[in-house]
């Protein structure tokens, strides 16, 4: 079998902000800049099954990237701070980049599924790719999952996961590793509200600990069904209910990061040399951990839903999330 497709994805990042003098006396202009990358990708692939449960995948993608800066101008009165004109904007073209990347993957899947997920078997995917063109980097993925019955309907689900990029331009593709699909209890919002208001510039916000170009994650879950004869008699719109307790651990780092299991109080979240070369030393990345409980259900037989309650470890300012 084969696949062929096209996708376009915009990515936005904060730029600079500040005020500049205006030609009108008593006024200034407040400027905000946002950096935007638009990825346009044409991709294709061939799937070659070698058995009922495993296959090889050969893919090729070509990507064109347009980089520009979005600028917003707001004139305002110096004395009062009130706007004196409508907000205006412009787009400044910066550069264009292009690269192609062939990929090769081996996939195995013999898992048996229930209403809300697998309950027996294993799944794995190992993939490598090398970009060719303006941006050059090596990309690798390793995802291994097991589902083992412990006793009766109780299932132990485990996962080991790695994704990363290395090479000359790998640092251009940084990502955030605190999503609910990787390490629960460490979403971006939980840091922004609690831990980005303390420390100086060299300490930065703790959210930087989960930003990088490589990630390694381990998840352990103990799952069991809640659907029984009592619940079956209630008019609930769920085809199945399942609960679980879990433990997550993960690490996100860059090519030059200093990796630790536990962080010291004075370890920097960002490279201090970008403020003062004399400070030297890379940023420190440490393993983040969390535990919690989860409730899952299949709404109307076709829409799986999940509710997680997690307690991040090593974050005294956040008790649960």
Show where each model-derived region lies.
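C-terminal outer-membrane beta-barrel translocator/porin domains of Gram-negative envelope proteins
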Residues: 5-11, 16-35, 42-45, 64, ...
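Surface-exposed, low-complexity/disordered segments
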Residues: 34-37, 41, 48-55, 60
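Charge-patterned, long linear interaction tracts outside catalytic cores
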Residues: 54-56, 64-69
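Membrane-spanning beta-strand positions in outer-membrane beta-barrel proteins
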Residues: 55-59, 155-157, 304
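Conserved active-site loop/cleft motifs that coordinate metal ions or position small ligands
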Residues: 244-246, 303-310
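Short glycine-rich, acidic/polar surface loops and turns
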Residues: 290-296
């Amino acid at each position: 079998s084969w696949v062929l497709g096209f996708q376009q994805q915009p990515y936005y990042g904060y730029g600079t902000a500040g005020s500049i003098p205006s030609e009108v006396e008593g006024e200034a202009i407040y400027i905000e800049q946002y950096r935007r990358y638009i990825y346009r990708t044409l991709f294709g692939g061939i799937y070659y099954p070698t058995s009922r449960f495993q296959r090889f995948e050969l893919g090729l993608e070509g990507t064109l990237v347009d980089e520009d800066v979005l600028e917003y101008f707001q004139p305002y009165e110096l004395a009062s701070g009130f706007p004196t004109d409508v907000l205006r904007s412009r787009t400044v073209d910066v550069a264009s980049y292009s690269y192609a990347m062939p990929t090769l993957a081996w996939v195995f899947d013999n898992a048996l599924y229930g209403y809300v997920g697998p309950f027996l078997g294993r799944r794995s995917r190992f993939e490598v790719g090398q970009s060719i063109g303006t941006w050059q980097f090596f990309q690798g993925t390793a995802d291994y999952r097991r589902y083992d019955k412990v006793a009766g309907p109780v299932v132990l689900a485990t996962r080991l996961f790695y994704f990363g990029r290395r090479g000359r331009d790998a640092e251009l593709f940084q990502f955030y590793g605190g999503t609910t699909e990787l390490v629960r209890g460490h979403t971006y919002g939980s840091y922004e509200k609690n831990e980005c208001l303390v420390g100086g510039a060299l300490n930065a916000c703790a959210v930087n600990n989960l930003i990088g170009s490589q990630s390694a994650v381990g998840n352990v879950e103990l799952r069991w069904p809640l659907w029984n004869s009592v619940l079956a008699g209630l008019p609930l719109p769920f085809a199945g209910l399942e609960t679980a307790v879990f433990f997550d651990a993960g690490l996100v780092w860059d090519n030059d990061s200093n990796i630790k299991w536990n962080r010291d109080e004075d370890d920097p979240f960002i490279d201090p040399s970008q403020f003062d070369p004399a400070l030297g030393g890379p940023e420190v990345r440490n393993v983040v951990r969390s535990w919690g409980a989860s409730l899952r259900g299949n709404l109307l037989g076709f829409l799986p839903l999940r509710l997680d309650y997690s307690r991040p470890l090593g974050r005294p300012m956040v008790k649960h999330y």
